[in-house]
C-alpha cells in the first residue's frame, strides 16, 4: 500500500472543491465508514437510512450534501455529490498503480504466437496465451492466465484481469476493463430440434464488439452473435455474473447489475439501467433512459420510463397492485359477505 498523506480540513476543502463547516486545522489521515471512523478519518453521508450513524459518527469530517442537517461542533465538507468528492480524497490518499501487478513487460512463461502484434508498453503476465493474429494496443495489461483467441484485437490502455477468456475474432476498444473470469465470445445458445427430438447445434459465426471505456464484472459472459455482432456500447458498466446472449446490442452508458440475463437479439438504448436479477426476453428493445427494477421480468419492448414486476409494468402500476395484493384477504372476506347477503336476499324473495 502506498504511504498515506495527511491533510488539514482547509487543504481538503481546496482539494475536493467543497465548502468547509468546522475546524480548518483538523488533521485527516485516512478514510472509513461512518460507524468505524475516528477523529483522524474522513467519511461521507449520502443516504438517509444512515442518518443515525451520521449523528453518532466520530469521524473527523463527513462529506455531506447541501441539504443534510448539520450538528453543531462537528466538521463537514459540503458537496453537491458527497460520494464523488469522497472518492477524490480516497484516490489522493491511496493512489492506484496503473495496473494491478508487480510484473512489467512480457513474462517468459507467456505463450505468444509469432504472428501476434504487441504494442508499446504492454504487460503480459505469466501463463497468458496470445493466439494467432492477435493485436494488442499500446499500454494494455494482460493478466496471468488470460487467453486471447485468434485474430482478436485489444485496444489501447485496456486492463484484462487474470483468467479472462476472449475467444477468436472479438474486438475491444480503448480503456476497456475486464474483471477476472469474464468470457467474451463464447458460442451463443442456439439449437434446432429434429424430428427425433434431438437438439442440433447451430454454429455461431459472428463476434463480439466491446466499445471504449466499458467495464465488465467478474464471471460475466457475453456470447458471440450467430451471424453479425454482439455489441456493448461505449461507457457501459456491467456487474459480476451477468449473461448477455448472442446478437444483443447494449447501448452507450448503460448500467447492468449482477445476475441479470438478457436473451438473444434484444437491444437497449442509451443510459438504460437494469437492476439485479432482472430477466429480459429476446428480440425486444428498451428505449433510452429505461429503468428496470430488480427481479423484474421484461416480456415486451419498453418505452422510456421505470418498470417493475413480472411481467414488467410501469412502476406506478406495480406499486398500486402491490397495495391491492396486501389487502386481498380483506377483499376476499368482503366478497364472501356480499355473496352471503345476496343469497339471504334471494331466499327472502
UniProtKB/Swiss-Prot annotation:
UniProt-listed Enzyme Commission number(s): 2.3.1.191
Main EC class the enzyme belongs to: transferase
Top-level lineage group: Bacteria
Subunit structure: Homotrimer.
Pathway the protein takes part in: Bacterial outer membrane biogenesis; LPS lipid A biosynthesis
GO molecular function: N-acyltransferase activity
GO cellular component, one term: membrane
Biological role stated in the UniProt entry: Catalyzes the N-acylation of UDP-3-O-acylglucosamine using 3-hydroxyacyl-ACP as the acyl donor. Is involved in the biosynthesis of lipid A, a phosphorylated glycolipid that anchors the lipopolysaccharide to the outer membrane of the cell.
Residues the record marks as active site: 246
Similarity comment: Belongs to the transferase hexapeptide repeat family. LpxD subfamily.
Keywords: Acyltransferase, Lipid A biosynthesis, Lipid biosynthesis, Lipid metabolism, Repeat, Transferase
Protein name: UDP-3-O-acylglucosamine N-acyltransferase
GO BP field: lipid A biosynthetic process
Record SUPFAM superfamilies: Trimeric LpxA-like enzymes (SSF51161)
Catalytic activity: a UDP-3-O-[(3R)-3-hydroxyacyl]-alpha-D-glucosamine + a (3R)-hydroxyacyl-[ACP] = a UDP-2-N,3-O-bis[(3R)-3-hydroxyacyl]-alpha-D-glucosamine + holo-[ACP] + H(+)
Gene: lpxD
InterPro entries to which the protein is assigned, alphabetical: Hexapep, Hexapep_transf_CS, LpxD, Trimer_LpxA-like_sf, UDP_GlcNAc_AcTrfase_non-rep
Amino acid at each position: 500500500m502506498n504511504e498515506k498523506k495527511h491533510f488539514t480540513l482547509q487543504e481538503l476543502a481546496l482539494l475536493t472543491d467543497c465548502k468547509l463547516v468546522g475546524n480548518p486545522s483538523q488533521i485527516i489521515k485516512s478514510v472509513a465508514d461512518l460507524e468505524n471512523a475516528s477523529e483522524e478519518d474522513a467519511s461521507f453521508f449520502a443516504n438517509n437510512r444512515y442518518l443515525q450513524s451520521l449523528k453518532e459518527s466520530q469521524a473527523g469530517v463527513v462529506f455531506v450534501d447541501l441539504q443534510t442537517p448539520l450538528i453543531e461542533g462537528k466538521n463537514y465538507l459540503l458537496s453537491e455529490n458527497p460520494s464523488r468528492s469522497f472518492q477524490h480524497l480516497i484516490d489522493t490518499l491511496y493512489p492506484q498503480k496503473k495496473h494491478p501487478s508487480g510484473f512489467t513487460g512480457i513474462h517468459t512463461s507467456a505463450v505468444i504466437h509469432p504472428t501476434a502484434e504487441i504494442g508499446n508498453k504492454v504487460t503480459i503476465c505469466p501463463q497468458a496465451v496470445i493466439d494467432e493474429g492477435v493485436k494488442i494496443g499500446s499500454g494494455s495489461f494482460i493478466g496471468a492466465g488470460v487467453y486471447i483467441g485468434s485474430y482478436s484485437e485489444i485496444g489501447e490502455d485496456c486492463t484484462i484481469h487474470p483468467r479472462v477468456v476472449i475467444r477468436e475474432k472479438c474486438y475491444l476498444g480503448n480503456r476497456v476493463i475486464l474483471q477476472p473470469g469474464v468470457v467474451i465470445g463464447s458460442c451463443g445458445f442456439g439449437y434446432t430440434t429434429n424430428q427425433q427430438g434431438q437438439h442440433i447445434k447451430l454454429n455461431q459465426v459472428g463476434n463480439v464488439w466491446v466499445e471504449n471505456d466499458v467495464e465488465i464484472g467478474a464471471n460475466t459472459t457475453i456470447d458471440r452473435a450467430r451471424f453479425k455482432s454482439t455489441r456493448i456500447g461505449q461507457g457501459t458498466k456491467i456487474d459480476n455474473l451477468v449473461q448477455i446472449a448472442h446478437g444483443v446490442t447494449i447501448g452507450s452508458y448503460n448500467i447492468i447489475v449482477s445476475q441479470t440475463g438478457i436473451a438473444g437479439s434484444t437491444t437497449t438504448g442509451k443510459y438504460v439501467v437494469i437492476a439485479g436479477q432482472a430477466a429480459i426476453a429476446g428480440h425486444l428493445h428498451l428505449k433510452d433512459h429505461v429503468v428496470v427494477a430488480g427481479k423484474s421480468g421484461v416480456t415486451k419492448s419498453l418505452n422510456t420510463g421505470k418498470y417493475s414486476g413480472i411481467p414488467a409494468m410501469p412502476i406506478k402500476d406495480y406499486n398500486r397492485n402491490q397495495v391491492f395484493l396486501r389487502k386481498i384477504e380483506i377483499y376476499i372476506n368482503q366478497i364472501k359477505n356480499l355473496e352471503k347477503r345476496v343469497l339471504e336476499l334471494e331466499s327472502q324473495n
